[in-house]
Amino acid sequence: MNGGYAICAGLEQVIDYICNLKFEDDDIQYLNSLNKFSDKFLDYLKTFKFTGDIWAIPEGTVIFPNEPLLTVRAPIIEAQIIETMVLLLLNHQSLIATKSTRIVSAAKGSPVMEFGARRAHSIDAAVLGARAAVIGGCVGTSCTSTAQKFGTIASGTMAHSFVQSFDSEYDAFKAYAEVYPDDCTLLIDTYDTINSGVVNAIKVFNDVLLPKGYRPKAVRLDSGDLAYLSKKVRKILDENGFEDCKICVSNSLDENLITSLLEQGAKIDSFGVGENLITAKSDPVFGGVYKLSAIEKNGEIIPKIKISENVAKIINPGFKKVYRFYSKETEKALADVITLHDEQIPDNNYSIFDPENPWRKKALLNYYCKPLQEQILKNGELVYSLPNLESISKHCKDELNSLWDEVKRINNPHKYYVDLSQKLWDLKNDMLHKA
């Protein structure tokens, strides 16, 4: 994405897929009908089970370009069979989680709710996209299936069709308030926000809620000039004694529009974000790739490299690890370094350099570092404890707090260092020159 960082998401679904992958009789029959596969291969699929090892970066972790999010060490046929689903699941949810963090950041602490199910590209895109949005910081989702399945908050308000189905706007608001007196949020822009919507909302607050001892939760705006209308509505609510009534807005919001609204002094307490979040409309493709970087023969790991005229598509060879360095003084992330799997990181004084411009060097001092990947599967068996969605979301928040604000800027972010170890850089260049 066009930002300074990304968020890793989708690992839980990758694990579920790989651990439960098998080929049923009807799958074998279909593949046989294509007349493309040998009986030996089809017999192999009948008893297929993934038997390899997998290491991965946990969900909610901040990631950067060229870093190995997931490493598979397995018989090559097993590694290739899982490729498409691994990419699909990681790319999709990492995309939405990243977009979510940008939108949540723009909201400057005001709650953001995911409202995008009706604009998602499929059922799975709605359900898993909402999950990813919560990882990125959304406080809830209007997709009740996601809330039920993953234990997050189901949030939403009335629809315009609900208001239209009554003889009057007042009648609609009154009926809603009588059913939800303790959680009353009224949609006030169906007809005329200022001359009708907020007026009828206040009448219902006085006629229904106050006599029962309740206070209104919020009003919602879903159209029009949100900056102007929110200021007018705030003034009217305050003048009528409802200073505690929140204002929620929606309507094709994204991080840029939210930033603009707040810069204009809009009186907004929360945001409902739909299509621009659930589709990551501004940058709808996450470019994760799945490449062979080494093979193992007789216990020896032999590095491999893919070469391209496009420098960005030249992979880093070998069986790798990635480490993140933190300042002991500030606890902020300093740089990431990709190494070969058998390298050791010294306790202090580590020199990093720009892989594209190796004369640009920097000495890291007074740091601590940690490997980003954890082992997930060993010999095909799960050895990793899956965190719940709340824990993943908290981890994401902690990860973002470890970055300098300059790296998190929505526009023109500072470039975070992702460097290669000297050993890996030498290996890569040697292989390029010999190719």
Predicted segments with their positions:
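Ordered alpha/beta subdomains of enzyme catalytic regions
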Residues: 1-182, 210, 215, 291-435
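Glycine-rich phosphate/ribose-binding loops and adjacent secondary-structure elements
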Residues: 161-333
